Design a protein with these regions (language model features):
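Solvent-exposed, conformationally flexible loop/turn segments
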Residues: 155-156, 194-199, 223-225
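Well-ordered alpha-helical segments within folded domains of soluble proteins
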Residues: 240, 304-325, 369-383, 411-427, ...
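Beta-strand-rich recognition/accessory modules
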Residues: 31-36, 41-43, 63-73, 107-192
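Solvent-exposed, low-complexity, repeat-rich "mucin-like" stalks and linkers
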Residues: 186-209
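Long, well-ordered core segments of solenoidal/helical folds
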Residues: 256-303, 334-357, 391-410, 434-458, ...
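Aromatic-lined, polymer-binding surfaces characteristic
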Residues: 351-439, 445-452, 456-476
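Extended acidic/polar, glycine-enriched regions
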Residues: 205-266
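Polysaccharide-binding surfaces and accessory modules of carbohydrate-active proteins
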Residues: 10-127
Protein backbone atom coordinates (compact mmCIF):
# COMPACT_ATOMS: atom_id res chain seq x y z
CA UNK A 1 0.00 0.00 0.00
CA UNK A 2 1.46 3.36 -1.04
CA UNK A 3 1.56 5.95 1.73
CA UNK A 4 2.38 9.66 1.78
CA UNK A 5 4.78 11.39 4.12
CA UNK A 6 5.79 8.99 6.88
CA UNK A 7 5.59 10.59 10.31
CA UNK A 8 5.71 7.50 12.47
CA UNK A 9 6.97 3.95 12.42
CA UNK A 10 5.15 1.88 15.04
CA UNK A 11 5.28 -1.90 14.94
CA UNK A 12 1.99 -3.73 15.41
CA UNK A 13 3.27 -6.20 18.02
CA UNK A 14 5.01 -3.59 20.17
CA UNK A 15 3.26 -3.41 23.56
CA UNK A 16 4.81 0.04 24.15
CA UNK A 17 3.74 1.33 20.70
CA UNK A 18 7.01 3.22 20.39
CA UNK A 19 7.28 5.63 17.47
CA UNK A 20 10.79 5.04 16.13
CA UNK A 21 10.80 8.37 14.25
CA UNK A 22 11.50 11.63 16.05
CA UNK A 23 9.00 14.38 15.37
CA UNK A 24 11.36 17.33 14.83
CA UNK A 25 12.91 16.12 11.54
CA UNK A 26 11.11 14.77 8.45
CA UNK A 27 11.64 11.19 7.29
CA UNK A 28 13.36 10.60 3.92
CA UNK A 29 13.83 14.27 3.12
CA UNK A 30 16.42 14.75 0.38
CA UNK A 31 19.03 17.51 0.42
CA UNK A 32 20.87 17.99 -2.86
CA UNK A 33 22.42 20.72 -5.04
CA UNK A 34 19.93 22.99 -6.88
CA UNK A 35 20.64 21.25 -10.20
CA UNK A 36 19.06 18.06 -8.82
CA UNK A 37 15.50 17.06 -7.94
CA UNK A 38 14.19 14.11 -5.96
CA UNK A 39 11.05 12.00 -5.76
CA UNK A 40 10.26 9.86 -2.70
CA UNK A 41 7.80 6.96 -2.60
CA UNK A 42 6.79 4.97 0.48
CA UNK A 43 4.92 1.68 0.53
CA UNK A 44 3.77 -0.38 3.52
CA UNK A 45 3.19 -4.10 3.68
CA UNK A 46 2.22 -4.89 7.25
CA UNK A 47 5.15 -3.82 9.43
CA UNK A 48 7.56 -3.54 6.49
CA UNK A 49 8.09 -0.07 5.03
CA UNK A 50 9.76 0.29 1.63
CA UNK A 51 11.17 3.70 0.77
CA UNK A 52 12.33 4.51 -2.76
CA UNK A 53 14.19 7.70 -3.65
CA UNK A 54 14.94 8.72 -7.23
CA UNK A 55 17.37 11.62 -7.63
CA UNK A 56 17.45 13.25 -11.08
CA UNK A 57 20.14 15.51 -12.50
CA UNK A 58 18.63 18.41 -14.44
CA UNK A 59 21.77 20.35 -15.33
CA UNK A 60 23.25 20.98 -18.76
CA UNK A 61 26.81 19.77 -18.05
CA UNK A 62 28.38 16.80 -16.21
CA UNK A 63 28.22 16.87 -12.41
CA UNK A 64 30.40 14.64 -10.20
CA UNK A 65 28.99 14.25 -6.69
CA UNK A 66 30.99 13.28 -3.62
CA UNK A 67 29.87 11.44 -0.50
CA UNK A 68 28.45 14.62 1.03
CA UNK A 69 26.71 16.13 -1.98
CA UNK A 70 23.36 14.41 -1.41
CA UNK A 71 21.78 13.45 1.91
CA UNK A 72 18.61 11.62 2.93
CA UNK A 73 17.23 12.02 6.44
CA UNK A 74 16.57 9.10 8.77
CA UNK A 75 15.35 10.64 12.07
CA UNK A 76 15.58 7.91 14.71
CA UNK A 77 14.91 8.32 18.44
CA UNK A 78 18.56 8.16 19.48
CA UNK A 79 18.42 10.75 22.25
CA UNK A 80 18.60 10.85 26.01
CA UNK A 81 15.71 12.16 28.09
CA UNK A 82 15.28 10.32 31.39
CA UNK A 83 16.27 6.68 31.87
CA UNK A 84 12.69 5.38 32.10
CA UNK A 85 11.71 7.04 28.81
CA UNK A 86 14.95 5.86 27.24
CA UNK A 87 14.31 2.29 28.32
CA UNK A 88 11.01 1.98 26.41
CA UNK A 89 10.90 4.78 23.82
CA UNK A 90 14.46 5.53 22.69
CA UNK A 91 17.01 3.55 20.68
CA UNK A 92 20.69 3.08 19.99
CA UNK A 93 21.20 3.43 16.22
CA UNK A 94 24.06 1.30 14.88
CA UNK A 95 24.62 2.64 11.36
CA UNK A 96 26.74 1.06 8.63
CA UNK A 97 27.16 2.88 5.33
CA UNK A 98 29.16 0.22 3.52
CA UNK A 99 28.36 1.03 -0.12
CA UNK A 100 25.86 -1.50 -1.56
CA UNK A 101 25.68 -3.29 1.79
CA UNK A 102 24.35 -0.63 4.14
CA UNK A 103 22.03 -0.98 7.09
CA UNK A 104 20.86 0.35 10.44
CA UNK A 105 20.38 -1.89 13.46
CA UNK A 106 18.41 0.19 15.96
CA UNK A 107 18.06 -1.38 19.42
CA UNK A 108 15.58 -0.18 22.01
CA UNK A 109 17.64 1.15 24.91
CA UNK A 110 15.97 -1.13 27.44
CA UNK A 111 16.52 -4.19 25.27
CA UNK A 112 12.87 -5.22 24.77
CA UNK A 113 11.86 -6.31 21.26
CA UNK A 114 10.67 -5.45 18.72
CA UNK A 115 13.62 -3.40 17.51
CA UNK A 116 14.00 -1.60 14.17
CA UNK A 117 16.09 -2.67 11.21
CA UNK A 118 16.79 -0.97 7.90
CA UNK A 119 18.60 -2.49 4.94
CA UNK A 120 19.52 -0.87 1.63
CA UNK A 121 18.12 -2.86 -1.31
CA UNK A 122 19.14 -0.57 -4.20
CA UNK A 123 21.94 1.94 -4.55
CA UNK A 124 25.02 2.67 -2.47
CA UNK A 125 25.72 4.65 0.72
CA UNK A 126 29.23 5.72 1.72
CA UNK A 127 28.76 7.88 4.80
CA UNK A 128 26.38 9.38 7.29
CA UNK A 129 26.36 12.70 9.08
CA UNK A 130 24.34 14.13 11.92
CA UNK A 131 22.31 17.31 12.33
CA UNK A 132 21.55 18.23 15.92
CA UNK A 133 20.11 20.92 18.15
CA UNK A 134 23.20 22.29 19.90
CA UNK A 135 21.12 23.58 22.80
CA UNK A 136 20.55 19.95 23.83
CA UNK A 137 24.31 19.40 24.00
CA UNK A 138 25.21 15.82 25.00
CA UNK A 139 21.65 14.58 25.37
CA UNK A 140 20.65 14.26 21.72
CA UNK A 141 22.57 12.43 19.02
CA UNK A 142 20.52 14.22 16.36
CA UNK A 143 19.03 13.34 12.97
CA UNK A 144 20.95 10.97 10.70
CA UNK A 145 21.62 11.98 7.11
CA UNK A 146 22.56 9.07 4.85
CA UNK A 147 24.89 9.98 1.99
CA UNK A 148 24.93 8.15 -1.37
CA UNK A 149 28.30 7.16 -2.79
CA UNK A 150 30.07 9.47 -5.22
CA UNK A 151 28.65 9.32 -8.73
CA UNK A 152 29.25 10.85 -12.14
CA UNK A 153 26.05 12.40 -13.56
CA UNK A 154 25.56 13.27 -17.20
CA UNK A 155 22.58 15.52 -18.03
CA UNK A 156 19.37 13.54 -17.52
CA UNK A 157 20.95 10.81 -15.37
CA UNK A 158 19.16 9.45 -12.31
CA UNK A 159 20.21 7.63 -9.18
CA UNK A 160 17.96 5.30 -7.16
CA UNK A 161 18.12 4.46 -3.47
CA UNK A 162 15.72 1.97 -1.94
CA UNK A 163 15.55 0.49 1.54
CA UNK A 164 13.26 -1.58 3.68
CA UNK A 165 12.43 -0.94 7.34
CA UNK A 166 11.33 -3.93 9.41
CA UNK A 167 11.00 -5.16 13.01
CA UNK A 168 13.46 -7.64 14.51
CA UNK A 169 14.04 -9.39 17.82
CA UNK A 170 17.67 -8.42 18.44
CA UNK A 171 21.21 -8.80 17.08
CA UNK A 172 20.99 -12.42 15.94
CA UNK A 173 17.55 -12.01 14.41
CA UNK A 174 18.64 -8.82 12.64
CA UNK A 175 21.58 -10.65 11.10
CA UNK A 176 19.32 -13.51 10.02
CA UNK A 177 16.88 -11.09 8.43
CA UNK A 178 19.72 -9.52 6.43
CA UNK A 179 20.20 -12.88 4.71
CA UNK A 180 16.87 -12.42 2.94
CA UNK A 181 18.15 -9.44 0.92
CA UNK A 182 20.11 -9.89 -2.29
CA UNK A 183 22.37 -6.85 -1.90
CA UNK A 184 23.93 -7.94 1.39
CA UNK A 185 27.45 -9.23 1.99
CA UNK A 186 27.98 -10.30 5.61
CA UNK A 187 31.53 -9.49 6.72
CA UNK A 188 33.21 -10.47 9.98
CA UNK A 189 36.80 -10.00 11.08
CA UNK A 190 38.48 -12.20 13.66
CA UNK A 191 40.04 -9.03 15.09
CA UNK A 192 39.36 -5.47 13.98
CA UNK A 193 42.47 -4.15 15.74
CA UNK A 194 45.74 -6.06 15.45
CA UNK A 195 49.40 -5.40 16.17
CA UNK A 196 52.19 -5.48 13.56
CA UNK A 197 53.02 -9.06 12.68
CA UNK A 198 49.61 -10.39 13.68
CA UNK A 199 46.92 -11.62 11.31
CA UNK A 200 43.15 -11.28 11.23
CA UNK A 201 40.93 -13.65 9.28
CA UNK A 202 38.12 -11.82 7.49
CA UNK A 203 35.08 -13.95 6.62
CA UNK A 204 32.91 -12.89 3.68
CA UNK A 205 29.46 -14.40 3.24
CA UNK A 206 27.29 -13.17 0.36
CA UNK A 207 23.57 -13.74 0.82
CA UNK A 208 23.28 -14.56 -2.90
CA UNK A 209 25.01 -16.99 -5.31
CA UNK A 210 28.40 -15.51 -6.16
CA UNK A 211 30.57 -16.09 -9.21
CA UNK A 212 33.55 -13.91 -8.29
CA UNK A 213 34.69 -12.60 -4.91
CA UNK A 214 37.65 -10.24 -4.52
CA UNK A 215 39.28 -8.29 -1.69
CA UNK A 216 41.41 -5.37 -2.86
CA UNK A 217 41.44 -7.05 -6.27
CA UNK A 218 42.62 -10.45 -4.99
CA UNK A 219 40.31 -13.33 -5.97
CA UNK A 220 39.10 -15.70 -3.25
CA UNK A 221 37.86 -19.28 -3.41
CA UNK A 222 34.88 -20.57 -1.44
CA UNK A 223 35.82 -22.66 1.60
CA UNK A 224 34.24 -25.93 2.65
CA UNK A 225 32.04 -23.91 5.01
CA UNK A 226 30.50 -22.12 2.05
CA UNK A 227 32.10 -18.75 2.85
CA UNK A 228 35.15 -16.83 1.62
CA UNK A 229 38.15 -16.06 3.82
CA UNK A 230 40.84 -13.41 3.51
CA UNK A 231 43.88 -13.32 5.79
CA UNK A 232 44.86 -9.74 6.55
CA UNK A 233 48.27 -8.78 7.89
CA UNK A 234 50.48 -5.72 7.71
CA UNK A 235 53.62 -4.60 9.49
CA UNK A 236 52.82 -0.91 9.12
CA UNK A 237 50.52 0.80 11.62
CA UNK A 238 47.46 2.65 10.37
CA UNK A 239 43.93 2.23 9.07
CA UNK A 240 43.25 -0.23 6.27
CA UNK A 241 40.08 -0.36 4.19
CA UNK A 242 39.37 -3.67 2.51
CA UNK A 243 37.38 -3.18 -0.71
CA UNK A 244 35.18 -6.25 -1.06
CA UNK A 245 33.49 -7.00 -4.37
CA UNK A 246 31.10 -9.89 -4.95
CA UNK A 247 30.13 -9.86 -8.62
CA UNK A 248 28.74 -6.30 -8.92
CA UNK A 249 27.96 -5.81 -5.21
CA UNK A 250 30.51 -3.82 -3.21
CA UNK A 251 31.15 -3.27 0.47
CA UNK A 252 34.05 -2.52 2.82
CA UNK A 253 35.71 -3.63 6.03
CA UNK A 254 37.88 -1.26 8.10
CA UNK A 255 40.75 -2.61 10.20
CA UNK A 256 43.45 -0.95 12.30
CA UNK A 257 47.04 -1.97 12.81
CA UNK A 258 48.01 -0.44 16.13
CA UNK A 259 51.29 -0.23 17.99
CA UNK A 260 51.54 -2.64 20.89
CA UNK A 261 50.22 -1.13 24.14
CA UNK A 262 53.60 -1.12 25.86
CA UNK A 263 55.22 0.74 22.94
CA UNK A 264 52.34 3.20 22.68
CA UNK A 265 52.39 3.80 26.45
CA UNK A 266 56.14 4.44 26.41
CA UNK A 267 55.79 7.04 23.63
CA UNK A 268 52.80 8.64 25.32
CA UNK A 269 54.61 8.93 28.64
CA UNK A 270 57.67 10.44 26.99
CA UNK A 271 55.46 13.01 25.28
CA UNK A 272 53.73 13.91 28.56
CA UNK A 273 57.05 14.36 30.34
CA UNK A 274 58.63 16.37 27.51
CA UNK A 275 55.66 18.50 26.43
CA UNK A 276 52.77 18.44 28.90
CA UNK A 277 54.26 19.28 32.28
CA UNK A 278 54.25 22.89 33.39
CA UNK A 279 57.58 24.44 34.50
CA UNK A 280 56.77 28.11 33.96
CA UNK A 281 56.43 31.14 36.21
CA UNK A 282 53.00 30.42 37.74
CA UNK A 283 53.51 28.69 41.09
CA UNK A 284 49.99 27.26 41.23
CA UNK A 285 50.68 25.12 38.16
CA UNK A 286 54.22 23.96 38.94
CA UNK A 287 54.41 20.25 38.11
CA UNK A 288 50.90 20.05 36.60
CA UNK A 289 50.16 17.90 33.57
CA UNK A 290 48.14 20.01 31.14
CA UNK A 291 46.40 19.65 27.76
CA UNK A 292 48.61 20.31 24.75
CA UNK A 293 47.83 21.93 21.40
CA UNK A 294 49.62 19.89 18.74
CA UNK A 295 49.00 22.54 16.07
CA UNK A 296 50.39 25.54 17.93
CA UNK A 297 52.83 23.48 20.05
CA UNK A 298 51.74 25.09 23.30
CA UNK A 299 50.24 24.03 26.62
CA UNK A 300 46.55 24.74 27.17
CA UNK A 301 45.09 25.84 30.49
CA UNK A 302 41.92 27.79 31.21
CA UNK A 303 39.59 27.83 34.24
CA UNK A 304 37.04 25.99 32.09
CA UNK A 305 36.36 22.51 33.46
CA UNK A 306 37.71 20.46 30.58
CA UNK A 307 40.88 22.49 30.13
CA UNK A 308 41.98 23.07 33.72
CA UNK A 309 44.76 21.27 35.61
CA UNK A 310 42.52 18.78 37.44
CA UNK A 311 39.77 16.34 36.53
CA UNK A 312 40.59 13.95 33.63
CA UNK A 313 44.20 15.13 33.52
CA UNK A 314 44.76 12.80 36.48
CA UNK A 315 44.94 9.98 33.95
CA UNK A 316 48.36 11.18 32.78
CA UNK A 317 49.77 10.67 36.25
CA UNK A 318 48.15 7.24 36.51
CA UNK A 319 49.66 6.21 33.17
CA UNK A 320 53.20 7.25 34.07
CA UNK A 321 53.03 5.56 37.48
CA UNK A 322 51.81 2.35 35.87
CA UNK A 323 54.41 2.50 33.08
CA UNK A 324 57.17 2.95 35.67
CA UNK A 325 55.94 -0.12 37.55
CA UNK A 326 56.13 -2.15 34.34
CA UNK A 327 59.58 -0.80 33.35
CA UNK A 328 58.32 0.46 30.01
CA UNK A 329 60.20 3.77 29.92
CA UNK A 330 63.66 4.35 28.47
CA UNK A 331 64.50 7.38 30.61
CA UNK A 332 63.15 6.07 33.88
CA UNK A 333 64.91 8.65 36.04
CA UNK A 334 63.45 11.57 34.08
CA UNK A 335 59.94 10.11 34.13
CA UNK A 336 60.09 9.36 37.85
CA UNK A 337 61.25 12.89 38.63
CA UNK A 338 58.39 14.23 36.52
CA UNK A 339 55.91 12.05 38.40
CA UNK A 340 57.30 13.23 41.74
CA UNK A 341 56.67 16.81 40.65
CA UNK A 342 53.13 15.94 39.57
CA UNK A 343 52.51 14.09 42.84
CA UNK A 344 53.60 17.20 44.75
CA UNK A 345 51.33 19.37 42.58
CA UNK A 346 48.40 17.05 43.21
CA UNK A 347 48.81 17.16 46.98
CA UNK A 348 49.41 20.91 46.98
CA UNK A 349 46.69 22.02 44.57
CA UNK A 350 43.97 19.38 44.20
CA UNK A 351 43.66 17.12 47.26
CA UNK A 352 43.40 17.46 51.02
CA UNK A 353 45.20 14.28 52.03
CA UNK A 354 43.88 14.41 55.60
CA UNK A 355 40.17 14.77 54.76
CA UNK A 356 40.11 13.14 51.31
CA UNK A 357 38.58 16.19 49.62
CA UNK A 358 39.32 16.22 45.87
CA UNK A 359 39.00 19.63 44.24
CA UNK A 360 37.91 20.30 40.69
CA UNK A 361 40.61 22.83 39.82
CA UNK A 362 44.07 23.82 40.99
CA UNK A 363 44.34 26.25 43.87
CA UNK A 364 42.18 23.81 45.86
CA UNK A 365 39.19 25.34 44.07
CA UNK A 366 36.13 23.18 44.63
CA UNK A 367 33.50 25.72 43.59
CA UNK A 368 32.39 23.17 40.99
CA UNK A 369 31.54 19.98 42.87
CA UNK A 370 32.28 16.78 40.94
CA UNK A 371 32.28 13.24 42.31
CA UNK A 372 33.77 11.83 39.10
CA UNK A 373 37.15 13.23 40.19
CA UNK A 374 37.34 11.01 43.28
CA UNK A 375 37.91 7.51 41.84
CA UNK A 376 40.63 8.85 39.54
CA UNK A 377 42.40 10.40 42.52
CA UNK A 378 42.08 7.10 44.43
CA UNK A 379 43.62 5.29 41.46
CA UNK A 380 46.46 7.81 41.19
CA UNK A 381 47.51 7.46 44.82
CA UNK A 382 47.15 3.68 44.66
CA UNK A 383 49.47 3.53 41.66
CA UNK A 384 51.97 5.76 43.46
CA UNK A 385 51.75 3.46 46.50
CA UNK A 386 52.40 0.43 44.30
CA UNK A 387 55.37 2.21 42.70
CA UNK A 388 57.06 3.75 45.74
CA UNK A 389 55.58 1.84 48.68
CA UNK A 390 54.97 5.00 50.69
CA UNK A 391 52.14 4.37 53.18
CA UNK A 392 50.89 7.95 53.00
CA UNK A 393 49.68 7.34 49.45
CA UNK A 394 47.69 4.28 50.49
CA UNK A 395 46.17 6.22 53.40
CA UNK A 396 45.29 9.10 51.08
CA UNK A 397 43.51 6.67 48.75
CA UNK A 398 41.45 5.43 51.72
CA UNK A 399 40.61 8.97 52.87
CA UNK A 400 39.47 9.94 49.36
CA UNK A 401 37.27 6.84 49.19
CA UNK A 402 35.68 7.67 52.54
CA UNK A 403 35.09 11.28 51.45
CA UNK A 404 33.48 10.09 48.23
CA UNK A 405 30.89 8.14 50.18
CA UNK A 406 30.38 10.91 52.74
CA UNK A 407 29.08 13.02 49.85
CA UNK A 408 26.31 10.61 48.80
CA UNK A 409 28.59 8.54 46.60
CA UNK A 410 26.36 5.51 47.21
CA UNK A 411 23.92 6.74 44.53
CA UNK A 412 26.64 7.85 42.12
CA UNK A 413 27.94 6.03 39.03
CA UNK A 414 31.74 6.53 39.17
CA UNK A 415 33.97 5.77 36.20
CA UNK A 416 36.90 3.52 37.21
CA UNK A 417 36.41 3.18 40.96
CA UNK A 418 39.31 0.78 41.78
CA UNK A 419 37.40 -1.40 44.25
CA UNK A 420 39.33 -4.64 43.77
CA UNK A 421 42.72 -2.94 43.61
CA UNK A 422 42.18 -0.93 46.80
CA UNK A 423 41.01 -4.01 48.71
CA UNK A 424 43.95 -6.06 47.43
CA UNK A 425 46.51 -3.41 48.35
CA UNK A 426 45.06 -2.92 51.84
CA UNK A 427 45.16 -6.70 52.32
CA UNK A 428 48.81 -6.85 51.25
CA UNK A 429 49.69 -3.94 53.54
CA UNK A 430 47.97 -5.57 56.52
CA UNK A 431 45.58 -2.63 56.93
CA UNK A 432 42.66 -4.76 58.12
CA UNK A 433 40.68 -1.94 59.72
CA UNK A 434 40.78 0.21 56.59
CA UNK A 435 40.01 -2.87 54.50
CA UNK A 436 36.86 -3.56 56.51
CA UNK A 437 35.82 0.09 56.26
CA UNK A 438 36.13 0.38 52.49
CA UNK A 439 34.71 -3.08 51.84
CA UNK A 440 31.58 -2.14 53.80
CA UNK A 441 31.32 1.12 51.84
CA UNK A 442 31.67 -0.69 48.52
CA UNK A 443 29.07 -3.26 49.53
CA UNK A 444 26.59 -0.50 50.42
CA UNK A 445 27.28 1.16 47.07
CA UNK A 446 26.60 -2.04 45.13
CA UNK A 447 23.44 -2.71 47.15
CA UNK A 448 22.16 0.77 46.30
CA UNK A 449 22.87 0.37 42.58
CA UNK A 450 21.12 -3.00 42.53
CA UNK A 451 18.10 -1.42 44.21
CA UNK A 452 18.00 1.37 41.60
CA UNK A 453 18.25 -1.23 38.81
CA UNK A 454 17.85 0.35 35.38
CA UNK A 455 15.97 3.47 36.55
CA UNK A 456 19.24 5.40 36.38
CA UNK A 457 19.40 8.97 37.70
CA UNK A 458 20.73 11.62 35.32
CA UNK A 459 24.38 12.60 35.61
CA UNK A 460 26.45 15.00 33.48
CA UNK A 461 24.51 13.40 30.60
CA UNK A 462 20.90 12.29 31.14
CA UNK A 463 21.61 8.72 30.07
CA UNK A 464 24.76 7.24 28.58
CA UNK A 465 27.12 4.31 28.33
CA UNK A 466 29.20 5.72 31.18
CA UNK A 467 26.24 5.53 33.55
CA UNK A 468 25.38 1.91 32.77
CA UNK A 469 28.99 0.67 32.65
CA UNK A 470 29.92 2.01 36.10
CA UNK A 471 26.83 0.31 37.54
CA UNK A 472 27.93 -3.02 36.07
CA UNK A 473 31.56 -2.45 37.06
CA UNK A 474 30.92 -1.46 40.69
CA UNK A 475 28.58 -4.39 41.29
CA UNK A 476 30.86 -6.85 39.48
CA UNK A 477 33.91 -5.71 41.47
CA UNK A 478 32.00 -6.13 44.72
CA UNK A 479 31.14 -9.66 43.60
CA UNK A 480 34.86 -10.25 43.02
CA UNK A 481 35.67 -8.97 46.51
CA UNK A 482 32.83 -10.72 48.39
CA UNK A 483 31.95 -13.75 46.27
CA UNK A 484 28.26 -13.17 47.02
CA UNK A 485 26.06 -14.44 44.18
CA UNK A 486 23.54 -11.59 44.42
CA UNK A 487 26.18 -9.19 43.11
CA UNK A 488 26.86 -11.35 40.05
CA UNK A 489 23.12 -11.43 39.29
CA UNK A 490 22.90 -7.66 39.80
CA UNK A 491 25.83 -7.07 37.45
CA UNK A 492 24.30 -9.28 34.76
CA UNK A 493 21.18 -7.10 34.70
CA UNK A 494 23.41 -4.10 33.97
CA UNK A 495 25.56 -5.91 31.40
CA UNK A 496 22.48 -6.85 29.36
CA UNK A 497 21.67 -3.12 29.03
CA UNK A 498 25.31 -2.15 28.49
CA UNK A 499 25.74 -4.47 25.49
CA UNK A 500 23.03 -2.56 23.61
CA UNK A 501 25.37 0.44 23.26
CA UNK A 502 27.80 -1.67 21.18
CA UNK A 503 27.53 -2.07 17.42
CA UNK A 504 28.53 -5.04 15.26
CA UNK A 505 29.45 -3.30 12.01
CA UNK A 506 32.62 -4.50 10.18
CA UNK A 507 34.56 -1.36 11.07
CA UNK A 508 37.03 -0.97 13.94
CA UNK A 509 35.47 2.41 14.79
CA UNK A 510 32.10 0.76 15.39
CA UNK A 511 32.46 -2.95 16.08
CA UNK A 512 31.83 -3.56 19.79
CA UNK A 513 32.42 0.15 20.41
CA UNK A 514 29.92 1.94 22.63
CA UNK A 515 27.99 4.89 21.21
CA UNK A 516 29.35 8.26 22.38
CA UNK A 517 28.51 11.44 20.48
CA UNK A 518 29.57 14.49 22.50
CA UNK A 519 33.21 14.01 23.52
CA UNK A 520 34.59 15.90 20.53
CA UNK A 521 32.89 19.02 21.87
CA UNK A 522 33.91 18.82 25.52
CA UNK A 523 37.48 17.73 24.87
CA UNK A 524 38.23 18.77 21.30
CA UNK A 525 39.88 21.91 20.00
CA UNK A 526 37.22 22.27 17.29
CA UNK A 527 34.38 22.00 19.85
CA UNK A 528 32.25 19.87 17.53
CA UNK A 529 29.42 17.62 18.67
CA UNK A 530 29.14 14.33 16.82
CA UNK A 531 29.90 10.63 16.92
CA UNK A 532 33.23 9.95 18.64
CA UNK A 533 34.14 6.30 17.98
CA UNK A 534 36.19 5.14 19.71
CA UNK A 535 36.59 7.44 22.69
CA UNK A 536 38.75 6.51 25.66
CA UNK A 537 35.71 5.80 27.83
CA UNK A 538 34.59 3.33 25.15
CA UNK A 539 37.30 1.07 26.58
CA UNK A 540 35.36 0.85 29.83
CA UNK A 541 32.95 -1.63 28.24
CA UNK A 542 35.89 -3.88 27.43
CA UNK A 543 37.08 -3.64 31.03
CA UNK A 544 33.70 -4.81 32.32
CA UNK A 545 33.26 -7.58 29.74
CA UNK A 546 36.76 -8.87 30.52
CA UNK A 547 36.04 -8.87 34.25
CA UNK A 548 32.73 -10.65 33.66
CA UNK A 549 34.41 -13.28 31.47
CA UNK A 550 36.83 -14.10 34.29
Amino acid sequence: MRVGNVKEIVFSKDPKQMNWLREDFPYAEVKCPPEFSAEVQNEKDGDVLTTKIVVSYNGAHPYFTNAGSIGVSFPLQDRYTDSVTCRDYRCHAHVFCGENTSYIMALRMGGAAPHLGMVLTKGSLSAYSIERDLKLQSNDRGCFWLHPSAQEFAPGDTMTLEWKVFPHQGREDFREKLRAFSQVILVDAEQYVIYPGETSKVTIEPTFPAEKVTVNGVSLEKTEKGVYEYLFENEKTGEYVLSICVDEVKTICRLLVQERPEELAAKRCAFIVDHQQYHGKIKELQGAYLPYDNEEKILVCTPENDFNAGRERTGMGVLIARALQQNLLKDREKAEQSLREYHAFYLRELVNAATGLVCNCSGKDNSYFRLYNYPWAVTFFLECWKLWGEKEDLKTAVHITEKFYEQDGFRFYPIEMPIVMLCQELEKAGEQEDLKTVRDLFRRHADQLIEIGTAYPASEVNYEQSIVQPAAEVILQVYEVTGEEKYLCGAEQQIAVLELFDGQQPDYHLHEIAIRHWDGYWFGKRRVFGDTFPHYWSAENGRTFKRYAR
